[in-house]
């Protein structure tokens, strides 16, 4: 089968925004204008097409990143049909992992901001992730029809808060209830959308006289920015020559693809204005798969390699999301980077070294699906029938194996114990949690060995609430949930040398003998654990050394101080002794764990706690109460600035003090303040609190 759309006309984009910036409505309008949806779904009715999980419709927030395919030929039908694959990304900080996952497989992004709220805290997290993966982006300032809408303030915030070189491509005509349309600063024309047909048709008109001076000023700004694209253009600009429309667009595209500028569009998705022109900007200024660098990976022997976006290269793809579908089981969403895959083909999961058969292949439109026979380089689709694929795995042809760059997922910061309400649900709960953990790599499940409780851990309270909720809805498992527990860690502050560990047992027959001498020392934050073997002259034979490392690693899982995982500790093995007959790997394992325990307690052990970055936006009247409350929670106020609806307070607060904060903040500010929270760092727990935590653990 030949390729239906040339790869140069593909756009793989993500639509990303803070909660409530109107991202889902924007996506809905895109689906409407591209002709996929004939009735516009509104978020407030709970009918939006992209938000297809029940909870999303109830909460009005987007949780699952759904991938949708649509076609666009321009609002004036001025382009050849372009294939646009949209990955809808959640805006809530507990779902940052979803955003990270989708950024990994995108070529470009549309950042949606609210014209009233501007750049909100969560927007910065998403921006950082887009920077990490070098994703070119354009901005869409939405909700221009809302009271307090201010386009230029939002543009300014992209510069100051996100350090993005924002260049307006349009200006709004009017604002709030007088928002009429936009000025196209390239064409220097006003665009007026027809309200009778929900903005499907439009007219170019002259710019209103009162807005002309402002439009000319910003047109000049656009031209100056474009001149930076090359020396030839700069010469032309300095020589006073005009740029043609084609030259201007080519220069702006070039700069946008190099991530040197962020072009800014505006509109009101709800009022059917602006989304159409923003789609044109996606086609004109965001990359096709051939405009971004080839994907890097490594071959089986570790040699670096890359795959180019052509159908002629061997097939390679990255699985970026697993979703459980009530009708077909597991759906594996994947981005095909090179080659072609057909339904029925056998592929290799090179990360797990397992051969899998691709059953059916579907292309998703939100929650409707179309079955297709093949997927070519540059496309995004979902496969049914892959059994053992998790997020971040590479799929490729067996004859040319490659492992594409892995994704990195953060460690969870909060855990709760869950138990099924009835014994009959025990097995179902295990199955459900296993399924959910496969879908979401930032969610972990394990059994606490001491209490035999099932523990689930994730990125925040909302994250775990939604997991429990999904267990109830999708798997019909009712569960009791314990109090949230903080994921403390243990480490040491001092170095201790020459710690002896000796395990000798003589009880008739063959005995056990292992003897080690180690140094134990702190490492810098985030270094984890290192083991150095400095044994000279064979005082411990080589075959027993792995046993020493194993013995210490086992101790790291449950530290000597309070049974929490140990981090950032180094061990150097430099002396010991052995017995010709009685020594074994097991004996050295026991000796090493004895030495580690004793050394750890001498090396000034401390408890570390997760500290969260908290941002509270509050009306000024409640400022004192909010700051006082954060101080009471052991918070360190990092800064304050003016926010769109009051003051923005940034603080670092220990997670242990943040439980139930949403309710307390609501009652302290009569529901007028909002906050967002994300993991910041691990820091030493104050002595009195550490003592209480340790005693509570020991009394269990």
Swiss-Prot record:
One of its GO terms (biological process) is ribosome disassembly. GTP binds at residues 17-24, 88-92, 142-145. One of its GO terms (cellular component) is cytoplasm. Residues 8-290 form the tr-type G domain. Disulfide bonds: none annotated. It comes from the Bacteria. One of its GO terms (molecular function) is GTP binding. InterPro entries: EFG_II (IPR041095), EFG_III (IPR009022), EFG_III/V (IPR035647), EFG_IV (IPR047872), EFG_V (IPR035649), EFG_V-like (IPR000640), EFTu-like_2 (IPR004161), G_TR_CS (IPR031157). Its main location: cytoplasm. Keywords: Cytoplasm, Elongation factor, GTP-binding, Nucleotide-binding, Protein biosynthesis. PROSITE patterns: G_TR_1, G_TR_2. It is found in: Cytoplasm. Catalyzes the GTP-dependent ribosomal translocation step during translation elongation. During this step, the ribosome changes from the pre-translocational (PRE) to the post-translocational (POST) state as the newly formed A-site-bound peptidyl-tRNA and P-site-bound deacylated tRNA move to the P and E sites, respectively. Catalyzes the coordinated movement of the two tRNA molecules, the mRNA and conformational changes in the ribosome. HAMAP family: EF_G_EF_2_B. Belongs to the TRAFAC class translation factor GTPase superfamily. Classic translation factor GTPase family. EF-G/EF-2 subfamily. This is Elongation factor G. The lineage of its organism: Bacteria, Pseudomonadati, Pseudomonadota, Gammaproteobacteria, Aeromonadales.
């Amino acid at each position: 089968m030949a390729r239906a759309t040339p790869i140069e006309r593909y756009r793989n984009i993500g639509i990303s925004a803070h909660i409530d910036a109107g991202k889902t409505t924007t996506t809905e309008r895109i689906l409407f204008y591209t002709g996929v949806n004939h009735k516009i779904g509104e978020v407030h009715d709970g009918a939006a097409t992209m938000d297809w999980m029940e909870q999303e419709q109830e909460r009005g927030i987007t949780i699952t990143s759904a991938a949708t395919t649509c076609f666009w030929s321009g609002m004036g039908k001025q382009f050849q049909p372009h294939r646009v694959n949209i990955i809808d990304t959640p805006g809530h900080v507990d779902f940052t992992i979803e955003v990270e996952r989708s950024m990994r497989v995108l070529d470009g992004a549309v950042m949606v901001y609210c014209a009233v709220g501007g750049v909100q805290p969560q927007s910065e997290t998403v921006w950082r992730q887009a920077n990490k993966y070098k994703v070119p982006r354009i901005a869409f300032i939405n909700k221009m029809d809302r009271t307090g809408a201010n386009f230029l303030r939002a543009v300014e915030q992209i510069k100051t808060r996100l350090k993005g070189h924002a260049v307006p491509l349009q200006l709004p005509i009017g604002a709030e209830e007088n928002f009429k349309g936009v000025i196209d600063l390239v064409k220097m024309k006003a665009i007026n959308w027809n309200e009778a047909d929900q903005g499907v048709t439009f007219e170019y008109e002259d710019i209103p006289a009162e807005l002309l001076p402002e439009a000319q000023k910003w047109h000049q700004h656009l031209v100056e920015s474009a001149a930076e694209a090359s020396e030839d253009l700069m010469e032309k600009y300095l020589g006073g020559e005009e740029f043609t429309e084609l030259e201007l667009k080519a220069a702006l595209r070039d700069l946008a693809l190099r991530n040197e500028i962020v072009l800014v569009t505006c509109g009101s998705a709800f009022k059917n204005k602006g989304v159409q022109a923003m789609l044109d900007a996606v086609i004109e200024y965001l990359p096709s798969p051939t405009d971004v660098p080839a994907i890097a990976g490594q071959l089986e022997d570790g040699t670096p390699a890359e795959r180019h976006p052509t159908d002629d290269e061997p097939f390679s793809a990255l699985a970026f999301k697993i979703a459980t579908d009530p009708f077909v089981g597991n759906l594996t969403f994947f981005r095909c980077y090179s080659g072609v895959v057909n339904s029925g083909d056998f592929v290799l999961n090179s990360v797990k070294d397992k051969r899998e058969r691709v059953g059916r292949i579907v292309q998703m439109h939100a929650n409707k699906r179309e079955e297709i026979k093949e997927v070519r380089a540059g496309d995004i689709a979902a496969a049914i029938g892959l059994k053992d694929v998790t997020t971040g795995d590479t799929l490729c042809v067996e004859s040319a194996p490659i492992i594409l760059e892995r994704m990195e997922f953060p460690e969870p910061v909060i855990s709760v114990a869950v138990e099924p309400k009835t014994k009959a649900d025990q097995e179902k709960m295990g199955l459900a949690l296993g399924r959910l953990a496969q879908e979401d790599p930032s969610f972990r499940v394990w059994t606490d060995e001491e209490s035999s409780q099932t523990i689930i851990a994730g990125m925040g309270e909302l994250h775990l609430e939604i997991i429990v909720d999904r267990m109830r809805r999708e798997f019909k498992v009712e569960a009791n949930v314990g109090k949230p527990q903080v994921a403390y860690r243990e480490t040491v502050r001092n170095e201790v040398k020459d710690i002896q560990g000796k395990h000798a047992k003589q009880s008739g027959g063959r005995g056990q003998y292992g003897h080690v001498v180690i140094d134990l020392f702190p490492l810098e934050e985030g270094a984890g654990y290192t083991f150095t073997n400095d044994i000279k002259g064979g005082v411990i034979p080589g075959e027993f050394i792995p046993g020493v490392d194993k013995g210490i690693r086992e101790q790291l899982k449950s530290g000597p101080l309070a049974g929490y995982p140990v981090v950032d500790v180094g061990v150097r093995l430099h002396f010991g002794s052995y017995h010709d007959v009685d020594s074994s790997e097991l004996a050295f394992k026991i000796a090493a764990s004895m030495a580690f325990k004793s050394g750890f307690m001498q090396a000034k052990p401390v408890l570390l706690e997760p500290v969260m970055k908290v941002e509270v936006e509050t009306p000024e009247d409640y400022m004192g109460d909010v700051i006082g409350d954060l101080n009471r929670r052991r918070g360190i106020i990092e800064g304050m600035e003016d926010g769109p609806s009051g003051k923005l307070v940034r603080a670092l607060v220990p997670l242990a003090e943040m439980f139930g904060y949403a309710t307390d903040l609501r009652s302290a500010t009569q529901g007028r303040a909002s906050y967002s929270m994300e993991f910041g760092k691990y820091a030493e727990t104050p002595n009195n609190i550490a003592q209480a935590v340790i005693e509570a653990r020991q009394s269990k």
